[in-house]
Amino acid sequence: MTTQPTTANDIKGLIAMVATGRPLSEADATRAFEAIMSGNATPAQIGGFLMALRVRGETVAEITAAARTMRDKAARIQAPAGAIDIVGTGGDCAGTYNISTAAALVTAACGVPVAKHGNRAASSKSGSADVLAALGVNLDADLALVERSIAEVGIGFMFAQRHHSAMKHVAPARSELGTRTIFNLLGPLANPAGARFELMGVFAQEWVEPLAEVLGRLGAERAWVVHGSDGLDEITTTGPTHVAEFRGGVVRSFDITPADAGLPLAKAEDLQGADPEANAQALRALLEGVKTPYRDIVVFNAAAALVVAGAAEDLATGAARAAQAIDSGAAKDTLARMIAIIGAPAS
């Protein structure tokens, strides 16, 4: 028996359930998000549903359903079984250098395949797509080339707008609402390569444990969800970082500090970035071996990624490997090789 698509009339009942404070089952939430992402809900219904969820508070089941639906509708690519994504929700309004993007390059240079998923900046000065474009990556590269880059170089960039065309049905309502909704959490949960390992940053600590559970439900083998004590959606070097790890079906929470990786504390102003061109220049300098607080935070995040991927026993070991990948020129070479495959066409 075929499943009938959820219609605009059907979603009314689901909106009413949420509006009265009732949590949706994963099946009911899937029906709602299937309607929304298929264009079978009106803008008013989408806005009403998203705000009802926001006011009541989104549940693990609802976030899982939304992310799974987004994954199902994505333009998929293949990545090696051990691939990791290093990604943040954005929304921390910190205006830092591009940390996860640089950490992804360093992690790949250490031999761990990275299926990097990201977008242009929403609340910051420079998103991962912005800085990579400034470095010479072609955001519109054929998806087969992105797949090839991951396979041959160990890293490729999946530009979210290329992979999630279903978001066109949600964009008008999100724009008119002008406030955070469940969709601000979904990007890092909807990796088009289905990476089974993930280092994910989030803009608020309240989401650290729930999103680790969501990643587990979505099939992650091991994942860290992190939030810096300074508000960063990254592992920070200005103080402690709260971590929820999903592994072996269990979520475990703990805090880490730069000292765990043998790194010094930084000041927030030392991590301030600028526009994509300036951030690209800083990233190039980092790959050349220039030692700054930016390098330290990138090494720390890469160290964590290596731990998550099973390529380092602990943060100190991971940090040493990450630093060596930079100092040997391997990380710089990784960027050059990626650009050789998915670089912007000559003008």
Swiss-Prot record:
SUPFAM superfamilies: Nucleoside phosphorylase/phosphoribosyltransferase catalytic domain, Nucleoside phosphorylase/phosphoribosyltransferase N-terminal domain. 5-phospho-alpha-D-ribose 1-diphosphate binds at residues 88, 91-92, 96, 98-101, 116-124, 128. Mg(2+) 1 binds at residues 100, 234. Anthranilate 2 binds at residue 174. GO terms for biological process: L-tryptophan biosynthetic process. Catalyzes the transfer of the phosphoribosyl group of 5-phosphorylribose-1-pyrophosphate (PRPP) to anthranilate to yield N-(5'-phosphoribosyl)-anthranilate (PRA). Homodimer. This is Anthranilate phosphoribosyltransferase. It comes from Rhodospirillum rubrum (strain ATCC 11170 / ATH 1.1.1 / DSM 467 / LMG 4362 / NCIMB 8255 / S1). The lineage of its organism: Bacteria, Pseudomonadati, Pseudomonadota, Alphaproteobacteria, Rhodospirillales.
